[in-house]
Amino acid sequence: MTGRVCVLVMDSFGIGASLDAARYGDAGANTLVHIYEACKRGECDIEGVRKGPLMLPNLAGKGLYHAAMASSGLSFIDLATLAIPSGYYGYAVEQSLGKDTPSGHWEMAGVPVTFEWGYFPDKPYCFPEELISEFIKQCNLPGVLGEKHASGTIIIDELGEKHIRTGKPIVYTSADSVFQIAAHEEAFGLQRLYDICKIARNLVDKYQIGRVIARPFTGKPGSFKRTGNRKDYATPPPEKTLLDFLKEDGREVIAIGKIADIYAHQGVTQEIKADGNMALFDATLSAMKTAPQGSLVFTNFVDFDSSYGHRRDIAGYAHALEQFDARLPELDALLQPDDMVFIAADHGCDPTFPGSDHTREHIPVLVFGPQVNSKFIGRRDCFADIGQSIAEHLQLSSPLAHGVSFL
């Protein structure tokens, strides 16, 4: 058994449109480069918070810009001004049919999603009548509100007051395979929201829906705010993932943030919840201080996606990237001789793009650690190459069914 592995998923941090992006309406998407260019033009200044060009010295030193240029072919920065990357760097192409969170994470852990998720049509009253009537009946509800495609923050502003007055939860969806339920934590009850989400999870299985998401909020009309008590109720992966094999082998699998939810709590030995990217980074550092040899620490940094990508907040995304970048030396300082850190993403969510949905993009693959030398790993044809490489480093008894190790 050798070292430990820490995986940091920068949720939605794409680095260039995939070759099939046009099929998804995402031709030309590039989350990183478009944020970089907006900052360069002075469009991402936040008084007292950030100003000017995007500054990611630590990610740059680990090969982010080299990987992004290889991914997109765009010469958005002079590589001659950068040092040779300190670890492995490249990019990966998604083989799963979706551009969603479960697909990206499952593929990363060795299980590409080769089936089509179910989706709800973008029209008023988008959910099947049978689904809604059964949901109302089984949950003993007076009815529901919403029933459409919507931004989560906009729909609670629109319907939050009526929700409190009537006791009807707000149900909505997006371009992803999701059934989302928003409810006020005090007026409706947080545990009650979780309870009806569990019922919804069973009801949407027949429609091949990937996730039911609890979206609690607090506050008063005009100042409603979503809380950190979100929960994802995912359908289980169709095959065993890297996490399952590690757990079966007696390893510690420490899931931080929404990782456990994404894998339907399978293959996890310890779950740690935290709200916000910086709290998630704190939790990651704490886990790395005590994680035993041969273990996996796996963190999803959801704010990039939920707070900035979907909301098309370019300046906020830039600031979040800089905050994340500034914390990396703290992680470096905790690494033991044989440890490896993998930085990746699960899909794109270009904040300069129309709409509010994910974008079909390549993801960065950056690997560093005390024993990791500089190496361009090029284009990886499947996110599962990440999982296969982790399996090799952690010396699993047999390789994963998908993916090619780049170690």
UniProtKB/Swiss-Prot annotation:
SUPFAM superfamilies: Alkaline phosphatase-like, DeoB insert domain-like. Its main location: cytoplasm. Mn(2+) 1 binds at residues 11, 346-347. The lineage of its organism: Bacteria, Pseudomonadati, Pseudomonadota, Gammaproteobacteria, Legionellales. Isomerase that catalyzes the conversion of deoxy-ribose 1-phosphate (dRib-1-P) and ribose 1-phosphate (Rib-1-P) to deoxy-ribose 5-phosphate (dRib-5-P) and ribose 5-phosphate (Rib-5-P), respectively. Pathway: Carbohydrate degradation; 2-deoxy-D-ribose 1-phosphate degradation; D-glyceraldehyde 3-phosphate and acetaldehyde from 2-deoxy-alpha-D-ribose 1-phosphate: step 1/2. One of its GO terms (cellular component) is cytosol. Its EC number is 5.4.2.7. Mn(2+) 2 binds at residues 305, 310, 358. GO terms for molecular function: magnesium ion binding; manganese ion binding; phosphopentomutase activity. This is Phosphopentomutase. It is found in: Cytoplasm. It comes from the Bacteria. The gene is deoB. It catalyses: 2-deoxy-alpha-D-ribose 1-phosphate = 2-deoxy-D-ribose 5-phosphate; alpha-D-ribose 1-phosphate = D-ribose 5-phosphate. Its cofactor is Mn(2+). Keywords: Cytoplasm, Isomerase, Manganese, Metal-binding. One of its GO terms (biological process) is nucleotide metabolic process. It holds the Pfam family Metalloenzyme. Belongs to the phosphopentomutase family. Binds 2 manganese ions.
